[in-house]
Structure formats: structure tokens, C-alpha cells
Design a protein with these regions (language model features):
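Ser/Thr-rich, Proline-interspersed low-complexity disordered segments
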Residues: 21-23, 342-352
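N-terminal extracellular ligand-recognition/capping segment immediately after the signal peptide
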Residues: 30-36, 45-67, 72-79, 92-94
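Bacterial N-terminal signal peptides that target proteins for export
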Residues: 1-10
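Surface-exposed loop/turn motifs in large extracellular/passenger domains
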Residues: 44, 63-68, 82-91, 99-110, ...
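Right-handed parallel beta-helix/beta-solenoid
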Residues: 15-37, 53, 340
Length: 353
């Protein structure tokens, strides 16, 4: 039932997309008020063109119609909020975060998202579908998460094929909490924690999963760099019949004093399972007394819920190297022929008394 519902949500978005081919075109909108006016007038499949730079007001994009908002090479939208809508966003740059709420179906194509300072690049609170295509880049604001997902009030399907990164200052790459009944995710892109002088951000955080939530991690996940490297992936507090499958590459972040652990699993209960068949590689440490990260750290009774099959486990390494200074020979600055020979004086005769 879980897989069927997720498939229906996915196909709903995909099957409606052909309507875009015969859609009407509105715009271009040069400011947010013009964009809102087009949204109110739009019908299923309409393409809304935007151009230039605009800042959203407190009024969210909300429409019962399936829409495509498409930009030109100069289109920049600030503080965009989409609520209870089905929207395809393409060829636009989104600054100061993208917020999605309610039951929404959103697809990002060739979209670059940058979070405001201290805020996630993309924040989803609700249900529906979120598709992040492979040509998308999402970065969290300073110290903040790249993508934050909280399932509230409906089925949820999330597919990630693009690049996600936590903000500088140790932001996590992606956080999911909570995820419950009929929550399904396919994470096949690249997810990185942000770097920091002290502690790198975690690549992927999965917290508070319940019901029959299902997540497949098939991409490349890595913790951020710092004095202590961030963990590649953390799974904390999962229960019921939650299933997490890892067949991608998970790496702890490199650090000066401590390398990050590749995968940490703790507080697993019920019939929840974490199935590992990919690559888990701990982060390296570069200081002389640095401690590399572990490939897999399972805490307490979570051992009974973690299954390893055909999985490469490799702890990090201490990469400290002594600097063997070599004193160079003096440089010859002139030709041998230019050196004047030393004259040996002749002996002087002395008289004998």
C-alpha cells in the first residue's frame, strides 16, 4: 500500500506534465504582483513567464491549477513561498530560501536555491511530492540546512537527483523529521554538510521516523570539514516498520583533530530496519594525534535493527605527514672561469747571523 500510494503521487505529477505542451503562456511578469495576478488567472498547464529580479510578499503562490513558472537567464525570485499548489519551477534562481507548505506537488528543473542567513535553502512542511532534478543546486544559508523536510498532514514522496549542500558554518546537508505513514524518499543525488572551523555539518540527518516510512539512499553523502569532521549520515529514533536502505556512498567529513563517522545508528525500535549494501568510509584526521572516523557506529540495541550485506566498511586514516626539512646546498652564482685564482707568495730569504 505504501509503495502504491507513493507511485500514484509520482505518476500524478508526471502524467499531468503533457498538458504543459499545449498550455497557454502568460507574461512575462516583471514583479511579484504581476506574477500573483497571472497565478489567479491561470488554468491547468499554463506557463507563467518571469523576468528580472523580484521579491515575494507575504502572499504565497497558491492555485488549484497545475502551473509552470519559467524564467529567463535573468530571473531571480526572493523569499518565494508555495502553498497547496502543483507547480513546476524551471530556469529560475531562488534566493533567501524557498518555502513549500500544505499539500503541494513541486518539481524543480534547472533551479538554483540559496537560503537566507540562518535559514534552510528549501523548507518543506506538509505532504504531496517534491522532485529535485539532477540539474538543480540547493545551498543552505549560513549555519543552516540545505533541505529540511517535515511530513505533516498527508502522504509524501520526495526524489532528489540534484546537489544539496549545508550552509557554511556547519549546516547539515539535508534533515528529515518527522516522516511517518506513507512517507517515501529516493535520495540519489549529492548531499554535503557545510564546512566549519570547529565542526563540519552532517550530510544527512534522519530523525523521528515512524509508521511504514521508506527511504532509499542511493547517492553520495558526505559530512562537512572542520576541526572535527561531520558525520556522513545519522539515523536517530526510528520505529514501527520503518525501512531505510543504503546502497550509495556515505563518507564522514575530514577533520584536523577528528574525522567524522560515516554512519551513526541509534534509538531504533519495533520492526524498523536499516539495510546496508553500499560503501561506508570514515573521515580522515590530519593532526599528528588526530582520530579518524569510523565507518559504522551502532549504539545500544540498534545493533539488532542494522543489517550489513555486501557493504564496504572502511575506517578513516590519519594522514599526518612529518615535514622533513632539507637544507639546500648553496647556489653557485658565478662561472668557474670568473673566479680569480689565489696567488701563493714566494718564500722570503732570511740571513743567518
Amino acid at each position: 500500500m505504501k509503495a502504491t500510494r507513493a507511485l500514484v503521487l509520482f505518476l500524478l505529477t508526471v502524467l499531468l506534465c503533457p498538458a504543459l505542451a499545449s498550455a497557454g503562456t502568460l507574461g512575462p511578469a516583471l514583479n511579484y504582483e504581476e506574477l500573483l495576478d497571472m497565478v489567479r488567472r491561470a488554468k491547468d498547464g499554463d506557463i507563467l513567464l518571469v523576468s528580472g529580479e523580484m521579491t515575494a510578499t507575504e502572499e504565497a503562490i497558491s492555485s488549484p491549477a497545475l502551473l509552470q513558472i519559467s524564467g529567463d537567464s535573468r530571473a531571480v525570485l526572493h523569499r518565494l513561498h508555495i502553498s497547496d499548489s502543483s507547480v513546476v519551477l524551471s530556469d529560475v534562481e531562488l534566493r533567501d530560501s524557498l518555502t513549500i507548505s500544505g499539500i503541494s506537488n513541486v518539481e524543480l528543473r534547472a533551479v538554483r536555491v540559496e537560503g537566507a542567513p540562518g535559514q534552510s535553502g528549501l523548507s518543506l512542511v506538509g505532504g504531496g511530492t517534491l522532485l529535485i532534478d539532477g540539474d538543480c543546486e540547493i545551498t543552505g544559508g549560513e549555519g543552516a540546512t540545505g533541505v529540511s523536510v517535515s511530513q505533516r498532514g498527508g502522504d509524501l514522496y520526495v526524489s532528489v537527483e540534484g546537489s544539496i549542500r549545508g550552509g557554511e558554518g556547519g549546516g547539515s546537508g539535508m534533515e528529515v523529521s518527522p516522516l511517518s505513514e506513507y512517507g517515501t524518499m529516493m535520495l540519489a543525488g549529492t548531499i554535503r554538510g557545510g564546512n566549519d572551523a570547529m565542526m563540519g555539518g552532517t550530510g544527512l540527518n534522519l530523525f523521528g521516523l515512524s509508521g511504514n516510512a521508506f527511504i532509499t539512499v542511493a547517492g553520495s553523502i558526505r559530512g562537512g570539514r572542520g576541526a572535527a569532521g561531520g558525520a556522513g549520515m545519522q539515523v536517530v529514533s526510528i520505529g514501527d516498520t520503518v525501512s531505510i536502505g543504503v546502497n550509495g556512498e556515505i563518507r564522514g567529513g575530514s577533520g584536523d583533530e577528528y574525522g567524522g563517522n560515516a554512519l551513526i545508528v541509534m534509538d531504533a525500535a519495533g520492526a524498523a530496519a536499516v539495510n546496508l549494501s553500499g560503501m561506508l568510509i570514515g573521515g580522515d584526521a590530519s593532526a599528528q594525534t588526530g582520530e579518524p572516523g569510523q565507518s559504522l557506529l551502532v549504539i545500544g540495541d540498534s545493533v539488532a535493527h542494522t543489517r550489513v550485506a555486501n557493504c564496504l566498511l572502511q575506517d578513516g586514516e590519519n594522514t599526518f605527514a612529518y615535514n622533513k626539512a632539507v637544507t639546500p646546498l648553496p647556489e653557485i652564482t658565478s662561472s668557474v672561469n670568473a673566479v680569480e685564482p689565489l696567488t701563493t707568495p714566494s718564500p722570503t730569504a732570511t740571513s743567518t747571523p
